[in-house]
């Protein structure tokens, strides 16, 4: 029992270096994918680039989840800034809003007050289990074709913070990045990024929430 307690305590400690390295690897893969799109300038290549970007966006969201649990740094302000800047803000996710949503999920898991179940119930029977491979494949194709945008918007509405001040930094960040890319004739990067955000990111996100245990 003592060994288990020791292992649990070690896992509960912030892991800044591991988090930063994982974040850099994901952004490196995204940068390489974007370079491939620039180099080949081919629609088929763009399709696979969007798949890769969406997959790595999902990985960044998982790193953001760790940051929401304060697993990045003991300094909470530093923890939240890094989590937002490198993981959540580029995805359009607000950290305080997500944290409230997610912590309530842990507190009310499996009950009628569980916000994740509320979201799933709004799209019933899409999340009705068991979910066969054929149905999962059909949902994947639907998501890739950007036919689940409404569902993405529903989830975004669940994580909007109540305090207006919590919107300032993320909006300034997004506005600055968008302006810099457009001014440098890199609007195509925005197009690929946002298409991935509402298609392949959601496709991989759906797969995970359908196969992971509830908790």
Model-derived segments and spans:
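Non-catalytic, topology-defining segments of multipass membrane proteins
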Residues: 1-54, 88-191
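Generic beta-strand or strand-like secondary-structure segments
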Residues: 59-62, 84-88, 104
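Active-site recognition of the HExxH zinc-binding catalytic motif
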Residues: 62-69, 73, 105-106
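Post-HEXXH active-site segment of zinc metalloproteases
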Residues: 74-88, 117-120
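Short acidic-hydrophobic sequence patches enriched in Asp/Glu that either
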Residues: 74-81, 94-97, 199
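Transmembrane alpha-helical segments that form the membrane-embedded catalytic/substrate-channel core
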Residues: 54-64, 94-96, 140-152, 193-215
